[in-house]
Regions:
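Ser/Thr-centric signal marking residues that sit
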Residues: 67, 90, 132-133
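Catalytic pocket-lining loop regions of alpha/beta-barrel enzymes
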Residues: 1-87
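Mid-to-C-terminal alpha-helical segments outside catalytic/metal-binding sites
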Residues: 3, 108-146
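Active-site micro-motifs of SAM-dependent methyltransferase domains
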Residues: 60, 94, 138
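Alpha-helix initiation/capping motif
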Residues: 15, 42, 67, 99-106, ...
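Short acidic/histidine-rich active-site segments
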Residues: 84-106, 128
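Residues that scaffold the ATP/ADP-binding catalytic core of kinase and kinase-like folds
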Residues: 25, 97-98, 139
Length: 146
């Protein structure tokens, strides 16, 4: 994370069952003025944990898990994450979204994630596509939309 901060590059964090520890690490870096931008890949945390990462400037990325019927806390996160702080992903070849759950995940299945996010957020697929494209541009410093 020090190198990412030094090079002004974003970090991609896969944090599973260790949100408290990761928040502590990021808070320590932030207190030193050295916390890089980044994204919490394949989000599986709680709304409270999400808020803590958002407060540190991180983005939250939702995978096929958001389509799972029993993923209630992730659904709540997907509904409440700010428009300018989320991404979507597939995590291929793992965690295929409904209706492909249990199969090998494919990049094309990101559309299932986007549709599910649109339903959860009571918006259109077009809105999800635009918001996540803009957010990816902002985080990764490239130009998709022009």
């Amino acid at each position: 994370m020090d190198l990412a901060f030094e090079l002004e590059l974003p970090v991609i964090i896969h944090c599973r069952d260790a949100a408290h520890e990761m928040i502590e690490i990021c808070n320590d870096l932030s207190n030193k003025g050295k916390c890089p931008k980044g994204v919490l890949h394949c989000w599986t945390g709680t709304p409270k944990e999400m808020k803590q990462f958002l407060d540190l400037g991180f983005y939250i990325s939702f995978s096929g898990i958001v389509t799972f019927p029993k993923a209630h806390e992730i659904h709540e996160c997907a509904k409440t994450v700010p428009n300018d702080k989320y991404l979507i992903e597939t995590d291929s070849p793992f965690l295929a979204p409904v209706p492909n759950r249990g199969k090998r995940n494919e990049p094309a299945f990101v559309e299932n994630v986007a549709n599910y996010m649109a339903n959860l957020r009571s918006t259109e697929l077009f809105t999800i596509a635009n918001e996540t494209s803009k957010n990816a541009e902002d985080l990764f410093k490239f130009d998709l939309l022009s």
